Amino acid sequence: MLSCLAPSSSRFGQEDTIIQQSMPSTSPFAMQFPSLASTLLHHNQSPKHSNPGSSGIQDAHPNQPGAAADAFLVKCTQCHKRFPEYQSLSEHIASEHPHDKLNCGAAQPESDAEDEQSNMSGSSRRYAKSPLASNNNSSTANANNNSTSSQSMNNNSELAKNHNSANKMSPMCSPGSLTPGDLFAQLQHPPPQLPPHLHAQFMAAAASLAMQSARTASSPSQQQQQQLQQQQQLQQQQQHQMAMQQLLPPQLPGSNSSVGSNSAYDLDLSAPRSTSSPGSTTGDLSGAYPCMQCTASFASREQLEQHEQLHSPCGPAAVSNVSQTCRICHKAFANVYRLQRHMISHDESALLRKFKCKECDKAFKFKHHLKEHVRIHSGEKPFGCDNCGKRFSHSGSFSSHMTSKKCISMGLKLNNNRALLKRLEKSPGSASSASRRSPSDHGKGKLPEQPSLPGLPHPMSYFASDAQVQGGSAAPAPFPPFHPNYMNAALLAFPHNFMAAAAGLDPRVHPYSIQRLLQLSAAGQQQREEEREEQQKQQQHDEEETPDEPKLVMDIEEPETKEMAPTPEATEAATPIKREESREASPDPESYRSSSQAIKQEQEPLNVAEERQTPVEEHAPVEHAADLRCSRCSKQFNHPTELVQHEKVLCGLIKEELEQHFQQQQATSFALASASEEDEEDEEMDVEEEPRQESGERKVRVRTAINEEQQQQLKQHYSLNARPSRDEFRMIAARLQLDPRVVQVWFQNNRSRERKMQSFQNNQAAGAAPPMPIDSQASLTREDQPLDLSVKRDPLTPKSESSPPYIAPPSGEALNPEAINLSRKFSTSASMSPASISPSSAAALYFGAAPPPSPPNSQLDSTPRSGQAFPGLPPYMLPMSLPMEALFKMRPGGDFASNHALMNSIKLPDYRGTSLSPGGSEKRSWRDDDSRISHEDEFGAGVLMPPKPRRGKAETHGHAGDPDLPYVCDQCDKAFAKQSSLARHKYEHSGQRPYQCIECPKAFKHKHHLTEHKRLHSGEKPFQCSKCLKRFSHSGSYSQHMNHRYSYCKPYRE
């Protein structure tokens, strides 16, 4: 509220009349306007503000020269600042105290020094800014000010009047304070009679005393509340000012406002100013610094600069709600860490991200990341789920789908039952093989499988809608086709299918199937893993094998050949029997690992015998396999790529040789009497050396896989000495890391082959049988033959790389040649393949045509005991004590092979294991080449020496300059301990990629890389972590997981 009204200078000399006539003399009025009379009477006492006519007032009051010095100054009740006139006070209240007009709190007193300082500063500013104000127009200004004051505070004045009329007290006083009338009533003597202007001052002093007494009487809690109210009002005022600054239109720097001033009453008062209520936004409080990008303006430059950061793309993080922004591409990020990761693409893209995409501007650190990114543009999705059919372009997405239970089948771990499902699909009638279990398996938490009854339909018949035909009984109506894996999973979960059929329930929709499926996946997981391993071993033995495999199946105890009849009738009758006996005598090697698996040995032969009852039908080609047959030689292949390679490279050579030498091929009968006698002697010696523990024990065959490197070493030993002693057998076995018995049997089998070759050549020279037609010979090339890797072979015969043509029966028995040699594993021929010719056999092949120089005292032994080996070639000789250096000169590209085109075309290190058939997977590991010691220099003198200490894997290759690494690469500084390692290393420099993927255009240098790559297309993951059950398609990924992540990978939980 206003404490006084400013007088008008034009009313000079009439103040008493105005006071007495127009203003009431009650005490409330005197309290509201305490200094009204003094300011009206002594307004012009100051000499610098007085008119010439003011001397009359001074003469009229000569006794009060100093009383009027401060009487005409108006003081604000809120901040106690003094102003010379009402206009300045009203402007001050409107600008500085817009919210305090209704404040009933008492004002704090101010010291005299502060009063004088504020008085001088206020008067100087006022008269410096408004010099046009004079006494001549003071009446007009007074009228304008009064009207302005009444208009600006009409709401507050009305509320104050109502409050005063209701409570009969001053609005500046607290409700519990004393009024001046009450204060006068407490006095013993009435106040003296004073002149009007002194009486007004006296009343003002009494009012101030009343306020002080009320302030002292008020409680501390009320003071705290008043302070809190003042703080809230100050905060509201600041918020209001900020809102006004943002909403006000911009002003140019030359506007009518004081530059650099923060106070509203310091502005030019000549400009129009709104005096509306505090909630109004129409007041002109705009600053001198407007924003050029929006309509906001600010009073200081600092505020403007802080505001302009909101519009800047590179604003700092100190500004609220401003994200991190890249200074180069102006991309915004949520936090500084993402910005730092993004800046790598700008700062280090030239060094780290070398692989750039041609379709977009992205770059990658690794090439395989770029390859996976390119699939996004091309739409290629090489990874497919076998269970739901969904395909993926990234291997990570595919792995996440298969392992995170996004696919219901994988989430239920149906992948473990895949081998069993395939067997159900292939053999619908034989469920005995699927239900093979040992008695020890039961009782370990494993669920036994129930074979399906013969009268019930096959589970897969639901998809063909022929359940009634196969089952022979009424069945429910066929349902829509389900995915086979889903269907089989449900059938496996329901162990008793006959119960569902008898009850008229379909296992696909029975709710018990899913529950049973969950139990099966949890309880039978280990059982499925063991079964799958067993089936894989069994399939490897059952499937047809190509001669390209670096594996030789050895027989510990060969069946006596006396039992074989030489006549075709006996051969035909003995075929299934011998095959069953051989299968009975050959359980898996894993059956010897534990006692529980050993019990399976009694059950397995019977089941295998049932599967082998029709061997001819089993080897019959599949219907779709007719397309994978060679058009020239009618040879059957397992893979389209192998067929194309055969027709382009190999088959033409074979056809030319067949046309030139088909008259030399004759089908003769077998005369194995002498060879059988010698075999008996060898076996009797073996039996004497190792007597059998039980006379009633049947013969047991142990299959031993010998890789190609071991075969080469064995052939080298055999070429030096075909009949080594027992100690020499042990030395050879120790060097090759084989069992001595295996090495001994290998030598024995090679001697047996040589004797059979000798008998066959004798009968061929005598002309015992008429020549065989070319058709029967062509049919012979696609049948099973025993492996032969050590004897001399005729390069002109189509079967020379695997075995000599001695097992061709005279009468149409070429379809079943297994009765000739039933004691070893058969393999499918793949025609003349350079990959199957070893260096020693290739050297022996051409040794007779170009005999090398030999030592003068060296004793050469003729391998054939009688007759010629081949009619078209001179007799060949195998050296007994020839140094290994001489043998290596006969390798492809050597001195003795320079005149032979076929031998020069052989590149053994480049084409080992080139078969692409599923059955011809390479079993040799590159680790064997790196870790195995070279034996070339050990047999220089033809004597078996004590074994050398083996070199570690890390020592088999290094850099040039190492005396232990004599083989240095001429294209880099690497050195190797073996010539074979250097040859394989040079293959890396050649840039050749002969192994082509048929699914995509990728090609690889090594076959094992192609084998692992194919798993990406098939989805096969043969490697699994035993802890978290995560599966891997690559052995490298599996090794990395087991070596680095196995310690902290999370265990799998159902």
From Swiss-Prot:
One of its GO terms (cellular component) is nucleus. It comes from the Eukaryota. A zinc finger (C2H2-type) spans 74-97, 289-311, 324-346, 355-377, 383-407, 628-651, 967-989, 995-1017, 1023-1044. Residues 699-758 bind DNA. Residues 42-57, 158-168, 253-264, 707-719, 857-866 have a biased composition (Polar residues). The modification Phosphoserine is found at S582, S586, S934. GO terms for molecular function: DNA-binding transcription factor activity, RNA polymerase II-specific; RNA polymerase II cis-regulatory region sequence-specific DNA binding; RNA polymerase II transcription regulatory region sequence-specific DNA binding; zinc ion binding. Residues 676-689 have a biased composition (Acidic residues). Keywords: DNA-binding, Homeobox, Metal-binding, Nucleus, Phosphoprotein, Repeat, Zinc, Zinc-finger. Residues 42-65, 99-197, 211-283, 424-463, 521-623, 663-722, 755-815, 848-871, 910-958 are annotated as: Disordered. The keyword Flavoprotein does not apply. It holds the Pfam family zf-C2H2. Residues 133-157, 222-249, 274-283, 427-437, 564-576 have a biased composition (Low complexity). Residues 438-447, 527-541, 548-563, 577-586, 609-623, 690-699, 781-796, 921-938 have a biased composition (Basic and acidic residues). One of its GO terms (biological process) is germ cell migration. The keyword Zinc-finger applies. Gene3D superfamilies: Classic Zinc Finger, Homeodomain-like. It is found in: Nucleus. Mesoderm and mesodermally-derived structures in the embryo including the dorsal vessel, support cells of the gonads, and segment-specific arrays of adult muscle precursor. Also identified in motor neurons of developing CNS. Its main location: nucleus. PANTHER family: HISTONE H4 TRANSCRIPTION FACTOR-RELATED, ZINC FINGER PROTEIN 1. Belongs to the delta-EF1/ZFH-1 C2H2-type zinc-finger family. Involved in the development of the embryonic central nervous system, embryonic mesoderm and adult musculature. This is Zinc finger protein 1. It comes from Drosophila melanogaster (Fruit fly).
